Amino acid sequence: MTEKEKMLAGMSYSAVDEELLSELDAVKEIIHRYNLMSPADYAGRFDLLKNLLGHIGDDEIIINQPFYCDYGKQISVGRRFFANFHFTVRDEAPVTIRDDCFIGPNVSIYTACHSTDPVERNTRREWAEPVTVGNNVWIGGSVTILPGVTIGDNVTIGAGSVVTKDIP
């Protein structure tokens, strides 16, 4: 089993695997191009996102620059999606964001997990847990969503929150 297959299966994997590092570098190049595009070039930005992300619900998607992600293909967004400036997604595991979601500035979604034991952490092994955001969710500015969290439908997350557990 490759390290990428382990990562996608939620197993412990080497974060410094050559295949994974190469894929990360390729995505960084795409993200760099996206972040340099004119903010008024909605069609061009949408086309790039269609190729980068795993799924886009419709053409009513706006992700303001700058935007950052690790792999892109693990991210699925529903219809009528909006993310403000500095949206960061560490998508080592699937990140599913359903319909009619609004994300404030400086929001981060993390799926990668690291050991709290420094000796183990220094081996550069990690694992990942998926994040799911339901329909009609508003996530306020500067929110951090940690690995393994599910946020239910019709939820508002207040600005500055750190979401560590599921919210029904």
Predicted feature descriptions by range:
Residues 1-59:
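Terminal amphipathic alpha-helical/low-complexity segments used for targeting or macromolecular assembly
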Residues 138, 156, 162:
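Short-chain dehydrogenase/reductase
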Residues 67-77, 82-150:
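Flexible, glycine/small-residue-enriched loop-and-beta-strand segment within the central core
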Residues 4-5, 53, 123, 130, ...:
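Short secondary-structure boundary/capping segments
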Residues 59-61, 98:
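Short cysteine-rich loop/turn motifs with clustered Cys
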Residues 164-168:
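Short, intrinsically disordered, charge-balanced linker/junction segments flanking boundaries
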